[in-house]
Amino acid sequence: MAPVVPDPRRTKAFATAAAFEKWLAAHHARETELWLQIHKKASGRRTVTYAEALDVALCWGWIDGLKKSFDEESFLQRFTPRTAKSIWSQVNRDHVQRLVTAGRMTKHGQRQVTLAKADGRWAAAYAPIRSASAESIPEDLRAAIDSAHAH
């Protein structure tokens, strides 16, 4: 598989979530992707944060994708419109429920939710991947690990 190279013509930075939302309001229906440049906190430069950008994208029926390093102060996060095959994560379902309650969803974002509920993708949302907790480790394995650490 060839490496993904962001298109500079589709790369933008926004100082605020409101600026990103304004761009999506004007471009959500005709653009196929956006590589959003997000500056790291330590850079001292204010850009929309990943969490803010994800909320805005979900409200407009878009979704995050690949993340690529850009320079020492920032990274690029790819956003695209959801498709009929876009899978949902439980995390994004939770975000959407919060955004609906806050009255932030647009009709475009809500349409994606409605379609996902109708075709089963909403109910099939995958759970977040978490590291194993102590409770999920079999007792015999835990005893062996504890024994090994004791010696």
Annotate each PLM feature:
Residues 1-151:
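Charge-dense, helix-prone N-terminal extensions
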